């Protein structure tokens, strides 16, 4: 009996690395599936229509006009401080309660017929957690001339690397 027990014990011990690999693989696979699922889930807020977007080259031209739009950054503070569109207002991330509260406070005293351009640029616009909530809030407040800066990849790639003007926080 002792010999059988030692044989079974040795077999179990020998198989532990294999079992550990299987468990680890299952954990990583389920983690990867959760990650892929969360990336595939669109951010909350209203859809952005093509007519509500503005490409960087068009915004640059409009910024030179007398009646230029109000540009509002709804990205995290560190992105705004690092580099932002000249003259852009910062109202905090659109995905946070404080950011939306600050945006609402500013918007309450802003004429509803003013042209506004929102941008974030933290990530591809299709996954941005900040744009849609901010856009939804301005829509709810009655703003009709709100556009979203079209940044398919991020602010650095689609604005800075293409040579559009920037300024840094003071």
Regions found by a protein language model. Give the residues of each.
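Short hydrophobic beta-strand that contains or immediately precedes a catalytic carboxylate
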Residues: 59, 70-75, 88-91
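Rhodanese-like catalytic fold shared by cysteine-dependent sulfurtransferases
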Residues: 2-13, 17, 21-53, 81-170
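Short active-site oxyanion
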Residues: 63-71, 87, 145
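A generic local structural motif
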Residues: 56-60, 76, 102-105
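A short, well-structured juxtamembrane/interface segment
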Residues: 50-64
